[in-house]
Amino acid sequence: NPTLNAAVVLGGGGKYLVGFGNKSMSRALYEQVIEGFEELPEVGKGSNINMESVIALGTDLVILPERHQDLVPQFEAANIPVLVILDSTESFDTVRQTLTLLSTALGEEARAEKIITFLDAQSDNAEPLLEDVTEKPSVVFLGSSSALSVAPGSMIQTSLIEAGGGVNAVSGVDGVGKFIDVSIEQIISWNPEVIWIPQYADYTIDDLLNDPAWSSISAIQNKRVYVFPSSIEPWDQPTAAVGLGVAWALHNLHPDLYTKEALMQNVDEFYTIVYDKTFTAEQLGIE
């Protein structure tokens, strides 16, 4: 839940939380950084919110993503303040704006500035390394529920591909803030050199490598199919950790320019800033 994650990183854990929408996505991280995580109640997700639970928790502020702003009147009718953050059109600016807006409401402006500075540094550091790169790999970022869905240009996955020194192979399809269903014929026509799948996908790398329908694709033939980290929280979503997604993308596409050691230094810096913790490459699922 990228919206709730903004409150987690600005509080350095569960400081501002009385309830969760969905605990599952980043459970491996939240269990370690949010005291009493298991006791925090889930109040529903998406448009299925249990208003009685929200009211009973004595909620002072509800934060919603733009795609669920139609729920605002329900909370206003219950006299609960609502803050709409996280634009549906995803980019690094979306993350900056989300952290800035919520930090103002929580009085965490200085903390937000430090996190945004780290995010900006990842792209800034990548640019000079990529100056002389003439060949940028074509990449397709697949969706989680189906391998026959792709990230279009309006999603933050495209920003990650480009910041890491690649080119999104997807063309001719678009949608705001969601993966687009496509046919295997379309993916074959794009013939990506690299395929990334989310860590939370319902299928595996081997599923693709062993599927004859995919066998003519460059990324499959050269076994350049990778799980986008991390095992404790997604780095490919519009959250503060997307800066680590930039660093991993750069390492994955151009390992000669950006080493695993450099990547892990940035990982340690980020998690120290946000949670005063560090994690090993093994814990993060980074090979």
Task: Give residue ranges: language-model regions.
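Short, structured coil segments at secondary-structure junctions
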Residues: G13, G36, A78-I80, G164-G165, ...
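Structural recognition of the beta-strand scaffold that forms the well-ordered cores
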Residues: Y16-G21, L61-P65, P81-L86, P137-G143, ...
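A short, structured surface patch at a secondary-structure boundary
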Residues: N1-L57, L61-R67, A169
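Extracytoplasmic substrate-binding proteins
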Residues: L71-S149, V170-S171, V227-E287
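Alpha-helical scaffolding within the catalytic cores
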Residues: A121, N125-P128, F179-Q186, L209-S215
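Alpha-helical, coiled-coil/dimerization segments enriched in small aliphatic residues
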Residues: V150-K178
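A ligand-binding cleft/hinge motif common to bilobed small-molecule-binding domains
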Residues: Q69-A77, P198-N210
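Short helices/loops that flank or line small-molecule/ion binding pockets
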Residues: I49-G58, D181-N191
